[in-house]
Amino acid sequence: MKQSDSSGLRVSGLCYRVEGRTLLDSVELSVSPGESVAVTGPSGSGKSTLLMCILGLIKPQAGTITAGGREITGLKSAQLAQVRRATLGMVFQFGELLPELSPVENVALPVLLDGGRHQDAYRRAEELLDELGVPAGSTPTGMLSGGERQRTAVARALITEPDVLLADEPTGALDPDAKEGVARLLFTTARDRGCALLLVTHDLTVASRADRRHELQGGILAEAGAV
């Protein structure tokens, strides 16, 4: 596995085409530890595709991706899964939590699946949920409010102490009050924990919280306001 001197997230020369359409055209992007970058753009412009490439769920035709000092482009599936668990945290629009499990069980799950001790996983999950303001009782996650579910999803993404935190429309399904709380939580948490945060959103109000904003259109990623 190739090691890099840089931490955070770096994308270089990334290209992805599907059915003759270019979604990512030599994309260049870097996010330093503790920094936040928001990517906006029209629906279907390739924003989520960029995140899927970083996660290794789809394979780009060209380019390199380095996360947490590790070049992950071209890794075999077993190596990629290991690096993804250790280096990347992900928050989706709808949380992708198991509704029948309690918040603690959902948050502890990544550690348990990676062979961690049950006691340690649950203790850490309870600490994170308390820190993020989520009830840590036995109530099924599916019965929580939308904001509480997203906070639980953030806790689950953080339990492995990732170098890079990815968020795909994390506030898109929330009411205004919950949206404000989750957005504030994401940006504050990334800064305080030294995570490189890359967030995809249609919401310019949410995007304005980021240290930098980029727009993806026609396959080209450019910093907002750049000439």
Residue ranges: model-predicted function:
Residues 55:
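Helix-to-loop junction immediately C-terminal to a conserved catalytic motif
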Residues 63-71:
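Conserved ABC transporter NBD signature motif
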Residues 101-109:
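Short coil-to-helix segment of the ABC ATPase nucleotide-binding domain corresponding to the Q-loop/switch region
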Residues 128-142:
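Conserved ABC nucleotide-binding domain
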Residues 140-144, 148-150:
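Conserved ABC ATPase signature
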Residues 161:
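Conserved catalytic motifs of ABC-family nucleotide-binding domains
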Residues 165-168:
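Catalytic Walker B motif of ABC-type/P-loop ATPase nucleotide-binding domains
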